[in-house]
Amino acid sequence: MPLLDSFKVDHTIMNAPGVRLAKVMNTPKGDKITVFDLRFCKPNIEILPQKGTHTLEHLFAGFMRDHLNNNDVEIIDISPMGCRTGFYMSLIGTPSWEMVAKAWEESMKDILNVKSQDDIPELNKYQCGTCTLHSLDEAQDIARNILAKGVGYIDNEAIKLDMSKI
């Protein structure tokens, strides 16, 4: 089995919160697809709470589109990582990490302005696979933590995995 790009970085020295350029690829027609690692937590030290992560998924996807989509950039998907330390964001275009960080921080502010659980989009049994697995309080705690720490840059070369360690 091939070693995927996400496992070629040393998670023991990865800082968070931070934006990491995970991959850039071209479609057959030449469009650029960019994947960002939006690392909320320091791997193996912190973990996002399950209910808060699910709520964040519902809110973050829309708010990031509000702040980042433009004529040159369109978000395809934002999905939580299985390890619960962040999200992957795939998009058409190549925004700078600074643009991504600014949109992320603005999205966290938006999450803090959500008034009640009733305001979470698609929170019903028809549009959500586990509609009882949500916590606005946890999502807002995550947002407060990100804003308190600030979003930085994660340099792939600085955290390149020394393959002799595995």
From Swiss-Prot:
GO biological process annotation, one example: quorum sensing
SUPFAM superfamilies listed in its UniProt record: LuxS/MPP-like metallohydrolase
Keywords of this entry: Autoinducer synthesis, Iron, Lyase, Metal-binding, Quorum sensing
Reaction catalyzed: S-(5-deoxy-D-ribos-5-yl)-L-homocysteine = (S)-4,5-dihydroxypentane-2,3-dione + L-homocysteine
Protein's UniProt name: S-ribosylhomocysteine lyase
Highest taxon of source: Bacteria
Keyword Lyase part of the UniProt annotation: yes
E.C. number(s) listed in UniProt: 4.4.1.21
